[in-house]
């Protein structure tokens, strides 16, 4: 029997953007109706992709600023990062670029990143649309999410709704596939300098 693969996934994003609900629906199959801010939680889920069985450790994190110094403890030995935002919160997508991508690249520069839109079921919710219109905002569109994913160099962009379970499995199957890739550190060559080539002796 093939050795079971183990991979570690860390999920980050603004507080209340839907990270914990996404993990609970995937790992336990139930949607938590009461919001309890996360401090630090771990879940384990078995995922089968492309005929391979993977034990996926899911590390939930707190998005609130109070935990900015604690959160980096989650990153070591990770294989893939999910950066989440909420479709009903354009500000949470702004923070992907303003805060989350720089933090993730600082601690996990060589890992694949998936950008995940949570609460996709609220995109056409009349109450949400009305509420956001008061501040000249609108629910995040798929195109806006894809544009940010491209800008931050995400491995993939996905949308899901933990409440309806739509797209949830796809998020973690894609993340597991990404976690199984062989990663090379992303090196940004500074302007005016040439990349150093490594010599291989045969």
Swiss-Prot record:
<comment type="function">
    <text>Involved in the regulation of cell wall growth and actin cytoskeleton organization. Activates (1,3)-beta-D-glucan synthase.</text>
</comment>
<dbReference type="GO" id="GO:0070610">
    <property type="term" value="P:regulation of fungal-type cell wall (1-&gt;3)-alpha-glucan biosynthetic process"/>
</dbReference>
<dbReference type="GO" id="GO:0007165">
    <property type="term" value="P:signal transduction"/>
</dbReference>
<feature type="binding site">
    <location>
        <begin position="13"/>
        <end position="20"/>
    </location>
    <ligand>
        <name>GTP</name>
    </ligand>
</feature>
<dbReference type="GO" id="GO:0032956">
    <property type="term" value="P:regulation of actin cytoskeleton organization"/>
</dbReference>
<dbReference type="GO" id="GO:0035591">
    <property type="term" value="F:signaling adaptor activity"/>
</dbReference>
<dbReference type="InterPro" id="IPR005225">
    <property type="entry name" value="Small_GTP-bd"/>
</dbReference>
<dbReference type="GO" id="GO:0019901">
    <property type="term" value="F:protein kinase binding"/>
</dbReference>
<keyword id="KW-0449">Lipoprotein</keyword>
<comment type="similarity">
    <text>Belongs to the small GTPase superfamily. Rho family.</text>
</comment>
<keyword id="KW-0472">Membrane</keyword>
<dbReference type="Pfam" id="PF00071">
    <property type="entry name" value="Ras"/>
</dbReference>
<dbReference type="GO" id="GO:1902716">
    <property type="term" value="C:cell cortex of growing cell tip"/>
</dbReference>
<dbReference type="GO" id="GO:0007264">
    <property type="term" value="P:small GTPase-mediated signal transduction"/>
</dbReference>
<dbReference type="GO" id="GO:1905758">
    <property type="term" value="P:positive regulation of primary cell septum biogenesis"/>
</dbReference>
<feature type="lipid moiety-binding region" description="S-geranylgeranyl cysteine">
    <location>
        <position position="199"/>
    </location>
</feature>
<dbReference type="GO" id="GO:0032955">
    <property type="term" value="P:regulation of division septum assembly"/>
</dbReference>
<keyword id="KW-0342">GTP-binding</keyword>
<dbReference type="GO" id="GO:0005525">
    <property type="term" value="F:GTP binding"/>
</dbReference>
<feature type="binding site">
    <location>
        <begin position="118"/>
        <end position="121"/>
    </location>
    <ligand>
        <name>GTP</name>
    </ligand>
</feature>
<dbReference type="GO" id="GO:0003924">
    <property type="term" value="F:GTPase activity"/>
</dbReference>
<dbReference type="GO" id="GO:0140748">
    <property type="term" value="P:positive regulation of regulation of ascospore wall (1-&gt;3)-beta-D-glucan biosynthetic process"/>
</dbReference>
<dbReference type="GO" id="GO:2000769">
    <property type="term" value="P:regulation of establishment or maintenance of cell polarity regulating cell shape"/>
</dbReference>
<keyword id="KW-0488">Methylation</keyword>
<dbReference type="GO" id="GO:0009898">
    <property type="term" value="C:cytoplasmic side of plasma membrane"/>
</dbReference>
<dbReference type="GO" id="GO:0140453">
    <property type="term" value="C:protein aggregate center"/>
</dbReference>
<dbReference type="GO" id="GO:0060635">
    <property type="term" value="P:positive regulation of (1-&gt;3)-beta-D-glucan biosynthetic process"/>
</dbReference>
<dbReference type="GO" id="GO:0090334">
    <property type="term" value="P:regulation of cell wall (1-&gt;3)-beta-D-glucan biosynthetic process"/>
</dbReference>
<dbReference type="GO" id="GO:0140281">
    <property type="term" value="P:positive regulation of mitotic division septum assembly"/>
</dbReference>
<dbReference type="GO" id="GO:0032153">
    <property type="term" value="C:cell division site"/>
</dbReference>
<keyword id="KW-0547">Nucleotide-binding</keyword>
<dbReference type="GO" id="GO:0000935">
    <property type="term" value="C:division septum"/>
</dbReference>
<dbReference type="GO" id="GO:0032995">
    <property type="term" value="P:regulation of fungal-type cell wall biogenesis"/>
</dbReference>
<dbReference type="InterPro" id="IPR027417">
    <property type="entry name" value="P-loop_NTPase"/>
</dbReference>
<dbReference type="GO" id="GO:0043539">
    <property type="term" value="F:protein serine/threonine kinase activator activity"/>
</dbReference>
<dbReference type="GO" id="GO:0005829">
    <property type="term" value="C:cytosol"/>
</dbReference>
<dbReference type="InterPro" id="IPR003578">
    <property type="entry name" value="Small_GTPase_Rho"/>
</dbReference>
<dbReference type="GO" id="GO:0019003">
    <property type="term" value="F:GDP binding"/>
</dbReference>
<feature type="short sequence motif" description="Effector region">
    <location>
        <begin position="35"/>
        <end position="43"/>
    </location>
</feature>
<dbReference type="GO" id="GO:1903139">
    <property type="term" value="P:positive regulation of cell integrity MAPK cascade"/>
</dbReference>
<dbReference type="GO" id="GO:0030100">
    <property type="term" value="P:regulation of endocytosis"/>
</dbReference>
<dbReference type="GO" id="GO:0005886">
    <property type="term" value="C:plasma membrane"/>
</dbReference>
